Amino acid sequence: MVGGGVAAFDCSGDGLPELFLAGGAAPSALFLNRSVKAGQLAFEKTLTGVEVEGATGAYPLDVDGDGITDLAILRVGENQMMRGLGNCRFERANEAWGFDGGDAWHTAFAATWEKGADWPTLAVGTYIDRTQEDFPWGHCTTNWLIRPAPGERRFAPGAALEPGFCSLSMLFTDWNRSGTPALRVANDREYYKGGQEQLWHIAPGEAPHLFTEVEGWARLRVWGMGIASADLDGDTYPEYFLTSMADSKLQTLKAGPGKPAYADVAFKRGVTAHRPYTGGDIRPSTGWHAQFEDVNNDCRADLFVAKGNVWAMPDFAEKDPNNLLLQKEDGSFEEAGDRAGVASMATGRGGAVVDLNADGALDLVVVNRFAPAQVWRNSGQGLGHWLAVKPQMPGPNRDAIGAWIEVRAGDMTTRRELTRGGGHVSGQLVPWHFGLADQTEAEVRVIWPDGTEGPWQRVAADGVWVLSPGAEPVAWAP
């Protein structure tokens, strides 16, 4: 019903991301990327140690800071932390890392590194109580915050994030650029009682607690299924897109960083995505995975939304095509899913917008319910130049989660927050992609997780660059 995620990450070292697909009742699988660089896409299913039943989704991250990607697998039942061994081999690490995988219907995940920590902090979201299948309403289960054990490189027992309101997406995000991320939680109003969307204070050394209406957080009730974030208006603060049934939301800060008070600008921007735009079904849509990426390399973030009916819900569209919303010069978006060829009528869930063949054009993966997953190669004509950034830093947080990347190309400046979480049970660990339009070079800098601002550095377009603190950019090639 929910779940069906995909994780994209390069575990073979060839610069082409592999795909982990959650299998639900069937075993999950890892597909090695055998694509031709800048050519046809091809994948090979391979036994790697991640084949588990009951998987709902997965997120790649380097938990132990050894430079090898690990994988957090969400499941109906016990979650599994899989330690990367190199060459796309994995082993269970729950016991070695002190990770309590729980025994619930797990449907959301996020990770961050708190200040001074040498081990990540995780948030894990759960859905309805599986013992209440006959009457699930009002039976949402507990979410968890899992922090490092003091003085040890392992996890401490989790702290309950209560109340839980049937979470389907989580994201650690520095919403006000304070240097301390908070935790956003998207919740499904179908099953909770008295619930709402949530924003948690997660301050180092302090117990988590919710932002309140007194602090500016307004009650919002949606069928929250996915979160995507991007700075769309150039004010340095992220906007948040929330998928739902019927109209989706696009939230922007009302009056700066003083309080988390948001205005919904989805209608103004043209991203409500509230009903199908092709196929003849006019009932309300159901949105799942969402992701901002520049798919035509014009320096403007576009938006992909995976669509699909929950489970024979007659009041909602059965033929519900995915959205590919291209951002225009005025900041509004226009639908391009039909002419791009991605308006599938399959029942979509998780997804990934990612460069699968190292040609600088972002491709698309969607996991479907009751149908095979779909992969689309980006064969668009007239795409702009591009740049991909691979931040690397010494210490435990090697991939600089919590940093910001800023890119100046001509008179355009774009920025991205480096997060791990969000979407719908689908995560990626790949170089961060920026379109450059007609620019053949750009200036780039990283604002590192501790707030240190790296210098602006000039790099050539159409390549991947490694940025590290105190070092010159290095062109990366496998």
For each feature predicted by the language model, list its residue ranges.
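Short, conserved, GDST-rich strand-edge loop motifs in beta-rich repeat architectures
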Residues: V124-T141, A186-G194, V305-K319
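Beta-propeller blade termini
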Residues: G3-G13, L32-N33, A55-G65, T69, ...
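Loop/turn-rich, solvent-exposed surfaces of beta-rich toroidal or solenoidal domains
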Residues: P238, L242, K249, G287-A312, ...
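Hydrophobic beta-strand segments that make up the repeating blades of beta-propeller
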Residues: L16-G23, I68-R75, P120-Y127, M170, ...
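A detector of repeated loop/turn-to-beta-strand junctions in beta-rich toroidal repeat architectures
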Residues: P27, E78, H139-T142, G194-Q196, ...
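Aromatic- and Gly/Pro-rich amphipathic surface segment
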Residues: M1-A7, P17, L21-A25
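Blade-edge motifs of beta-propeller repeat domains
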Residues: M1, L32-G54, R83-A104, T121-A123, ...
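Gly/Ser/Thr/Pro-enriched helix-cap/hinge segments flanking short amphipathic alpha-helices
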Residues: A117-L122, T126, E152-R153, E206, ...
